[in-house]
């Protein structure tokens, strides 16, 4: 009779992915989550952003360990990942503020605030801009999202949407002009 046994499974890999990864992540979370949260706050993240960044760091650590990546010092890896997430958050905030500035800062009477992310008036302004972006035609909306949320250059936007870089620039220009017109018209009411 032919041997019809189950496929051979690397017991070490199975243990590593099922319990080793889990133990490593749990141990790190239990011992360092408060310090990681504090570090994220010192990077300038608000409480809810800091909490999300710590959770994202733990998730990324779990994924890396589960994929078999050897991480010599999970503690240092986690803090480095958290630092990068904090930097990414600041970059996103600058891009979003850049969009508001691009279509004409000072909407709703808020002027010369720079990129103060904690300013409630600025946050309302950014939300108003993205709400207006949502009402643009599909192609313009996609280009503005990829440019200002994903920070892609026009060459990559063109590749992503199957258009030329100059067409992407054109859609961005038209979309920005439409946003300026709509938002300033609402402001005049």
Give the label of every model feature segment.
Residues 3, 14-38, 48-51, 62, ...:
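A short, charge-rich alpha-helical start-of-domain segment used by transcription regulators
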Residues 11-16, 25, 128-136:
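Short amphipathic alpha-helical boundary/capping segments
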Residues 28, 32, 36, 40, ...:
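Residue-level preference for hydrophobic side chains embedded in well-ordered alpha helices
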Residues 33, 37, 58, 137, ...:
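C-terminal flanking helix
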Residues 52-59, 63, 72-84:
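Structural recognition of an alpha-helix C-terminal capping motif at a helix-to-coil junction
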Residues 66, 80-109, 114, 122:
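Arg/Lys-rich amphipathic alpha helix in sigma70-family domain 2
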Residues 83, 87, 155, 161-187:
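DNA-recognition helix of helix-turn-helix
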Residues 143-147:
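A short pre-motif secondary-structure segment
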């Amino acid at each position: 009779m032919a041997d019809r046994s189950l496929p051979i499974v690397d017991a070490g890999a199975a243990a590593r992915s099922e319990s080793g990864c889990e133990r490593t992540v749990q141990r790190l979370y239990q011992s360092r989550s408060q310090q990681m949260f504090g570090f994220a706050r010192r990077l300038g993240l608000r409480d809810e952003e800091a909490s999300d960044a710590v959770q994202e760091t733990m998730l990324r650590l779990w994924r890396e360990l589960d994929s078999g990546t050897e991480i010599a010092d999970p503690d240092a890896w986690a803090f480095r990942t958290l630092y990068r997430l904090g930097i990414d958050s600041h970059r996103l905030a600058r891009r979003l503020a850049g969009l508001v500035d691009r279509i004409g800062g000072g909407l709703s009477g808020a002027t010369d605030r720079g990129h103060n992310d904690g300013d409630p008036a600025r946050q309302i302004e950014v939300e108003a801009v993205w709400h207006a972006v949502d009402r643009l035609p599909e192609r313009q909306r996609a280009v503005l999202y990829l440019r200002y949320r994903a920070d892609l250059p026009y060459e990559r936007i063109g590749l992503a949407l199957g258009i030329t870089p100059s067409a992407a620039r054109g859609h961005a220009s038209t979309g920005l002009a439409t946003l300026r017109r709509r938002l300033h018209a609402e402001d005049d009411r």
